[in-house]
């Protein structure tokens, strides 16, 4: 059985290999990591179409054709079939996605702790490989203005709200119609 530290070490090494191998790709290669909040793994038209090939019955057949942009991105890009959250709380899960580390390593174990600016994110590695990076949407890790590793930012503090959300840029300045 692989030890916990060995598994984390292997995962982190894999991330570094993937990111640094990206420098060999052409300048026109785009990387878009799209993450939705509280969405089932099979709640897109793309996955409903794939269900029979997975030996499963489509649970939401009405979804087919209702998520055309997500479906196209899935068909034209890489789709990870076995991605799992390691923490069922927004901020720790998001920090884990950004770093490849478990919450006890990166230090975010609740929704109020600011993201440590000295922790390396995949965005830092992409910047080192010559990529321009951006983060758009819910940050929800404390209230700090800094978004380590991202050149362009449009986020809001905390959980956000349904109407009148004020977005902030990479310097923490309000932007947009509700600024």
Predicted features along the sequence, with ranges:
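Detector for intrinsically disordered, low-structure N-terminal pre-sequences
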Residues: 7, 16-18, 34, 85
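Formylglycine-dependent sulfatase
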Residues: 25-179
């Amino acid at each position: 059985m692989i030890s916990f530290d060995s598994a984390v070490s292997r995962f982190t090494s894999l991330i570094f290999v993937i990111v640094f191998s990206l420098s060999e790709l052409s300048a026109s290669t785009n990387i878009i990591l799209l993450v939705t909040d509280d969405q089932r793994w099979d709640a897109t038209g793309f996955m409903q179409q794939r269900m029979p090939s997975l030996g499963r019955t489509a649970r939401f057949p009405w979804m087919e054709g209702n998520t055309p942009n997500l479906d196209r991105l899935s068909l034209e890009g890489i789709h990870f079939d076995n991605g799992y959250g390691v923490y069922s709380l927004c901020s720790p899960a998001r920090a884990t996605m950004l770093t490849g580390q478990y919450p006890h390593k990166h230090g975010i174990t609740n929704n109020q702790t600011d993201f440590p600016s000295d922790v390396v994110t995949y965005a830092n590695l992409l910047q080192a490989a010559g990529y321009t990076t951006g983060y758009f949407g819910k940050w929800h890790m404390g209230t700090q203005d800094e978004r380590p590793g991202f050149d362009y930012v449009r986020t809001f503090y905390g959980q956000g709200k349904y109407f009148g959300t004020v977005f902030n840029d990479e310097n923490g300045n309000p932007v947009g119609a509700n600024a």
